[in-house]
């Protein structure tokens, strides 16, 4: 089956035609089942009219929008491949994406238009392949979808090779059925979407997800819950984690989705309270913001039953602090996944036995833990090893590369994990481990300790090499909390020394900064911080007295 058919063939009857995709800031901008279907079919016709053929990529460079899911299904329904990226992507990253996926069309916003034009000019791409998306065009598409009496003629707008076009032109071509796939073999090899990897250790890669992998992944993760589901999405929908909870659930199961353009604490709390949100998904940085907030968080989150957390490591103490902000029937739990493999570990609603774990392995997936020293497979519990994964929801490949998945179907995650009573725990990443006199130190463990101090708003730990080259040691970069007394470097170091083994001490020092580099979804960008740290060291050497 193809992805669009799967979306529209769910158990939801939509008898009441209740809103499914809702703009959290302007709830009147919403789409119920019939308008959503009409919009998808019209966008299928529009993307075809603008030259999208089977296998062509459409690069979607947008913040979260109420029409985002319709755009994705319109692209896929036309036979194309959706690829999302942030409108704030720097020029070099956008240039990389355009070279990597060779898009037929680029959907972008006014603030990014000049950068997109420059990149297209350098790549020999006509500006007529650029589609501008603004508030007016979103309004137009929503109104068009809701107004069943409006039937535009399939007359192509006048196109100028040197000028971008507007998204509202996409719905000027009538409706078209979507591309159908009836056999599993074809669905297994037909790309539907690509999602960029985090790029924390270099330029991002594009992981190809086929119709079959997306459907299989969804069927594995979905489960019934004993509460009415109304979700709030504040994560980037262009990222695989945000995408998963945004697109299929509303139309397939009738679960309303409120869409925020981006996370803002005050707006987030207001939307949860006002619209009785029962389920949402966050990254650890957002959990820390909730824990440290002086706003009436507990009163605002009373309707929530479940918060799923993923995207980066988070400690049990931070999760338990957030748990105390929720109603007694609610729970917060970690998930684990990657862009390349999807979500494969999950703490489901009601399972809170191991709050620091990433949950149980989901059905239909295989994993193995491999020792770092000799590469042998670990069979017992409580022994950390590098995590390898295989299963039906794993990516087809990286775009333009032949690495990533071995001949037996295993994907090497780079994460270090161990098991305990069928629940798994993440220790850290192999590339991020700090080698201190023969010991392996995970930065996330030190960060979790420092974040317990209310004076620490954010922190990131990296490894630096001592001047004599004898060993690496941890160095902490710290952002102080507003409205709190500023801690000294010695106080921060003492906090780590008091709670951790001596070889995990911050012997590389503590440096206070205004902000820390993170990816769009909140992952620590340690490679960028390490680069900045190296520049800082060079500058300090130049400025030091002779």
From Swiss-Prot:
PROSITE patterns: AMP_BINDING
E.C. no: 6.2.1.-
Disulfide bridge positions per record: none
Protein's recorded name: Nicotinic acid-CoA ligase olcI
Upper taxonomic lineage: Eukaryota, Fungi, Dikarya, Ascomycota, Pezizomycotina
Biological processes, Gene Ontology terms: secondary metabolic process; terpenoid biosynthetic process
Organism, as annotated: Penicillium canescens
Keyword entries, A-Z: ATP-binding, Ligase, Nucleotide-binding
Catalytic activity: nicotinate + ATP + CoA = nicotinyl-CoA + AMP + diphosphate
Name of one Pfam family that matches: AMP-binding
